[in-house]
Amino acid sequence: MQENVKAPKRSKKAEQRAETIEQILDAAEYLFSKHGLYGVTLKDVAKKVGVHHTLLNYYFEDKNKLFHAVFARRAVVTSERRMNALDQYEKACGDRPTVEGALRAFLDTDLDLYIEGGEAWKNYAALGAQVANTPEWGAELMDTHFDPVVLRLIDLLKKALPDCSEEDIFWGYQFVTGALMLTLARTGRIDKLSHGLCKSDDFVAVKERMASFMAAGFLQICGQGR
């Protein structure tokens, strides 16, 4: 009979270190989401956390590595969740995926994080929108963290639209991600244009509409909505 082996407890010092790193990442995420990579210094982050800036150099070496760590922390979560959702959707629908079904697995799963995850996830959403719209250095980060899940979506869309050209499917995805990034940026523009009828941080309203709207666009450009 096997005895239950308990995992060794982390030392208090290790716990404090992990907690400090999380505080640094949270503070950096907030500041980067508001001011961008070039509008924030390590001293700014250190001041918000209440530590000396040399501690940030010790843990992350420089600002770029801190930024990459901030971005990667939640990128892993959203990428894995969407990949699992796409896998589960394909398993459930067999050989008959629909455009809207694939888009809901991809988009709704991501939007749920911003609906349920509080302000921290909304900060990450704004940060992601910045990264996606900064080709000089953001494209590489997006490629590294999100290409696998995006290509998984593309694969399902090809199965849902077997007569659609690859060109139209990739353009369709371009329009999807453009709308998603603008939504994640929460610029407040729709608030002003609609005189308060719509709120840019109302991710529930976005979730109710985005996948079906984008699915109709795919069907149209692929000749099935004409």
Place the predicted regions along the sequence by residue:
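C-terminal peripheral helix-coil segments that are non-catalytic and often amphipathic
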Residues: 1-7, 116, 147-226
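Helix-turn-helix
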Residues: 23, 31-73
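Short, amphipathic alpha-helical "lid/cap" segments that border enzyme active or binding sites
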Residues: 25, 79, 100-107, 173, ...
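Short alpha-helical scaffolding segments that buttress acidic/His motifs in well-ordered protein cores
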Residues: 106, 110, 125-132, 176, ...
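Hydrophobic alpha-helical connector segments
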Residues: 83-122, 173
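Histidine- and aromatic-rich ligand-binding microenvironments
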Residues: 66-87
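Short, leucine-enriched amphipathic alpha-helices that occur as contiguous helical runs
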Residues: 17, 21-29
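Amphipathic alpha-helical segments used for helix-helix packing
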Residues: 101, 105, 116-144, 187-192
